[in-house]
A protein has these predicted regions:
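Sec/Tat signal peptide C-region and signal peptidase I cleavage site
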Residues: 27-31
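A Rossmann-like FAD-binding core segment of flavoenzymes
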Residues: 100-111, 127, 206-299, 354
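FAD-site-proximal beta/loop scaffold in flavoenzymes
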Residues: 150-178, 272-337, 348
Length: 375
């Protein structure tokens, strides 16, 4: 089993002081054995949870399972697509988290046995746990969009998981002729970071305005309304007049199928052929949540809103984008807040204490143009 180290993001760091202050109130009276808490998923939520657990009780044995040795953050990745930022600025290793005494297993989890409380890793290693936290993020729900599968992402990138997909979409925009049509297909809710498609349209428009001003952007949307809509529309009319068109659900904007061979996108009322097709498909909880049995028929994970305990599995908690968390948006800041609250709930449960309803926040900060002119 390989071990790496981790560096966290800003949202996690901001919560450290609050976690430390809560530690004196939430320390468990441990029995003979040291409780083993395992977190699957090293994104914002999982990392925040693992770190908070150790800070709330340094005696806990905390393991973070994450197959990627480098974390590539989604926030600000739209700026990478628009050429305003480079991908390495989005990437972080796992050094600092493990320096806090957290074991980071650089393997994918392949199976969870809730009755035996064990996790099988891709290399055959089996880990035992007392409490398990699932923070698997999202996966694309390919079955929900005819014509779109893993292979299609190489022609029609979603770029909804930051990394190679981000760079593929950027390269396609750079290679597109002036006057080309960029189509962004937006799915119905729930989805990761609901305002992000419109930020993406804005920043792609910024790139095209400077480099390929004859080009257009068409947003095909499976929703009628979206977060911060008036602000985006105002920015589009002022900064990119005539460049961005949006077709909403009631106007026939829902994408019903795609053809990667021709870059054709089919909607309820028309077909469109794109020079660059950014297809963001419907989403669901990360695959391990389904394998474990924590996801329901919706593809997402029902939880107790106070403790984040799974409603389908004992001794399992679910946080972040994968969870059905009421009105909280699926965002990085919300995932980090849930991770810290979940850690407190676990520590209180081990101590036999009740958990108060957490006060959670979630924020999505969107950019419609760079603060200073780009070169």
């Amino acid at each position: 089993m390989a071990v790496t180290r981790h560096q966290t993001r800003r949202d996690v760091v901001r919560g450290a002081a609050a976690v430390a202050a809560a530690a004196a109130l939430a320390r468990p009276a441990l029995a003979q054995a040291v409780p083993r808490i395992t977190v699957i998923g090293g994104g914002f939520g999982g990392t925040a949870c693992a770190w908070a657990l150790r800070r709330l009780d340094a005696k806990l044995q905390v393991t973070l399972i994450e197959p990627n040795r480098t974390f590539t953050a989604c926030p600000f990745s739209n700026e990478v697509i628009a050429g305003l930022r480079e991908l390495p600025a989005q990437q972080f290793t796992y050094d600092r988290v493990a320096a806090d005494g957290i074991t980071v297993a650089a393997q994918a989890a392949s199976k969870v046995d809730a009755q035996a409380r064990t996790i099988a890793l891709a290399d055959g290693t089996v880990l035992s746990y007392d409490r398990l936290v699932l923070a698997p993020g999202i996966d694309m729900h390919f079955d929900a969009l005819p014509g779109y599968d893993e292979a299609a992402t190489e022609k029609m990138p979603h770029a909804w998981k930051a990394g190679e997909q981000t760079m593929l979409l950027r390269r396609q925009l750079e290679a597109m002729d002036d006057g080309g049509l960029v189509v962004i297909a937006v799915p119905a809710a729930p989805m990761r970071c609901p305002p992000a498609p419109y930020e993406r349209a804005s920043l792609i428009a910024h790139y095209l305005k400077a480099r390929k001003p004859k080009s257009k952007i068409l947003v095909l949307d499976a929703k009628d309304n979206y977060s911060q809509q008036k602000l985006f529309e105002k920015a589009w009319s002022e900064l990119y007049p005539g460049m961005i068109e949006r077709i909403a659900l009631s106007q026939g904007g829902r994408v019903t199928s795609v053809d990667p061979a021709t870059n054709e996108i089919v909607t309820d009322f028309g077909n469109y052929t794109a020079a660059v097709a950014n297809v963001i498909p419907p989403q669901r909880a990360g695959r391990i949540a389904e394998i474990a049995g924590a996801a329901d028929h919706t593809g997402w994970c029902p939880i107790d809103p106070v403790t984040f305990a799974s409603k389908l599995m004992p001794n399992v908690h679910v946080i972040g984008d994968a969870a059905i968390a009421g009105g909280i948006p699926k965002s990085a800041s919300a995932a980090a807040a849930q991770g810290r609250a979940c850690a407190a709930a676990i520590v209180n449960a081990l101590a036999g204490k009740a958990q108060d309803a957490p006060r959670l926040d979630g924020a999505c900060y969107n950019t419609v143009a760079p603060a200073t002119p780009s070169r």
